[in-house]
Regions:
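Bacterial Sec-dependent N-terminal signal peptides
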Residues: 1-32
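A sequence-level/structural motif corresponding to short, flexible coil/turn segments enriched
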Residues: 26-182
Length: 182
């Protein structure tokens, strides 16, 4: 009798486990529903670096491309690769876009939304004044920080660095409303 009781208890435990597992699997196995999908690009090499939710429920896409006017891109290439920023609404429709660059390669590193609804973006630049860049190079490479308004228009820009290599890796908002650059 002692040998039967543990076996029955074990069998009941297994049955209960299977029932719970089956019920849980059915609840969690529901396929997610695709709300929308969107392919955005040029006929050249496009690199997406960031996708962020915006305060209006849309999305900001940031990356870089060697493509000129083609596909979805409406602005010419300035040289090498240019930063490419695309604002989407909540349904994935393009609201605006901006291609920002110099005569050399400009690969977007980060983009964050600002409290006024605009955007702060940046890259590492080794180029002087050319294309959209209005400030001279300081060192071998510098932070190039650009402020866009909520419509994607450049409001201001700043070149930051020393005499050597300064490579931007991150833009982080801080509670005071400013930003940390690293």
């Amino acid at each position: 009798r002692n040998n039967i009781t543990p076996k029955i208890h074990f069998a009941i435990t297994i049955v209960v486990f299977i029932v719970i597992s089956t019920f849980t699997t059915k609840l969690s196995a529901q396929e997610p529903v695709v709300q929308w999908d969107q392919t955005i690009g040029t006929t050249s090499n496009d690199n997406l670096v960031q996708v962020n939710l915006t305060s209006d429920g849309g999305f900001i896409l940031g990356g870089y491309t060697s493509g000129g006017i083609s596909g979805d891109k409406t602005e010419a290439n300035m040289g090498g690769t240019d930063m490419w920023v695309v604002k989407l609404d909540a349904l994935g429709n393009i609201q605006w876009q901006n291609s920002i660059g110099t005569s050399s390669s400009d690969n977007l590193v980060d983009i964050v939304q600002t409290v006024d609804g605009g955007f702060l973006l940046g890259c590492t630049s080794s180029t002087g004044i050319s294309g959209d860049k209005t400030e001279a190079a300081i060192g071998l490479s510098d932070f190039w920080i650009i402020k866009l308004n909520a419509s994607g228009v450049i409001m201001w820009q700043n070149t930051i660095g020393g005499t050597g290599n300064d490579n931007l890796t991150d833009i982080e908002p801080v509670p005071s409303g400013g930003f940390l650059l690293s």
